[in-house]
C-alpha cells in the first residue's frame, strides 16, 4: 500500500482523513511549519503543499479549509482560523447580525504533491449551510456554528459528518484519483 504524509497538527482532521481514504493509502502524519500566505483558497493550498513537499522530500497531502459567509461576499474564507481564534463561535455568529442571509459555504481543498518540484494537484469539496448560534461540542473548529439540513456539524456523529461534509467531498475526489493512479 502506498504511503502519503498528511501534513497536519490537527488530530481530528487526521482521524477524518484516515477514516475516509485509509482503505486506499497508508496515511502517515507529519507536522511541518508552513508559512501562512494570503491569496485565494487555491493559491494558499498549492503554496502550502509545495512548501511541505520540499520540507519532507517526498509525497505529501495538505489540507486547507475555508468558511465563506454569503452576506460578506465569501469572508472570512481561508482566514476562518484567525477569525475563530479572535472572535470565537458566538462572535462569528454575530458577524451576520443585521444581514438577511446567514448562508455560508464550507470549502475543503486537499493538495497532493508526489514530491519536491511537482505541481500540486487540488481536490475540492463544498457544502452549503447556514451560520447559527453554537450547538454541540466545541472541540473541532467552527463545527458548532455550521448547520447543514437542521444539524450543526458538531451535533452529527463522526459517521454522519463523514458522509456529507466538505472534507468528505474533497476526499472522495482524492480517493478516486488515487485508485486510478495506483491501478
Curated annotation (Swiss-Prot):
UniProt-annotated location(s): Cytoplasm; Nucleus
Binding annotation for Mg(2+): 36
Pfam family, one: Ham1p_like
One GO process term, biological-process aspect: deoxyribonucleoside triphosphate catabolic process
GO CC entries: cytoplasm; nucleus
Major localisation: cytoplasm
The reaction(s) this protein catalyses: ITP + H2O = IMP + diphosphate + H(+); dITP + H2O = dIMP + diphosphate + H(+); XTP + H2O = XMP + diphosphate + H(+)
Keyword Nucleus recorded: yes
Keyword Lipid metabolism attributed: no
Gene Ontology molecular functions: dITP diphosphatase activity; ITP diphosphatase activity; metal ion binding; nucleoside triphosphate diphosphatase activity; nucleotide binding; XTP diphosphatase activity
Cofactor: Mg(2+); Mn(2+)
Subunit (UniProt): Homodimer.
Name by which UniProt lists this protein: Inosine triphosphate pyrophosphatase
Organism: Emericella nidulans (strain FGSC A4 / ATCC 38163 / CBS 112.46 / NRRL 194 / M139) (Aspergillus nidulans)
Amino acid at each position: 500500500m502506498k504511503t502519503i504524509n498528511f501534513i497536519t497538527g490537527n488530530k481530528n482532521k487526521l482521524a477524518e482523513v484516515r477514516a475516509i481514504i485509509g482503505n486506499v493509502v497508508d496515511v502517515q502524519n507529519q507536522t511541518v511549519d508552513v508559512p501562512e500566505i494570503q491569496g485565494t483558497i487555491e493559491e494558499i493550498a498549492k503554496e502550502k503543499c509545495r512548501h511541505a513537499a520540499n520540507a519532507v522530500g517526498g509525497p505529501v497531502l495538505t489540507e486547507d479549509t475555508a468558511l465563506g459567509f454569503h452576506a460578506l461576499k465569501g469572508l472570512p474564507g481561508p482566514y476562518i482560523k484567525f477569525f475563530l481564534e479572535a472572535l470565537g463561535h458566538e462572535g462569528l455568529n454575530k458577524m451576520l447580525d443585521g444581514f438577511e442571509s446567514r448562508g455560508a459555504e464550507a470549502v475543503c481543498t486537499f493538495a497532493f504533491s508526489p514530491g519536491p518540484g511537482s505541481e500540486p494537484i487540488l481536490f475540492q469539496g463544498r457544502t452549503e449551510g447556514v451560520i447559527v448560534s453554537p450547538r454541540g461540542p466545541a472541540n473541532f473548529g467552527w463545527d458548532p456554528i455550521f448547520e447543514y439540513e437542521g444539524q450543526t456539524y458538531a451535533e452529527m456523529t463522526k459517521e454522519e459528518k463523514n458522509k456529507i461534509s466538505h472534507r468528505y467531498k474533497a476526499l472522495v475526489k482524492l480517493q478516486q484519483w488515487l485508485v486510478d493512479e495506483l491501478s
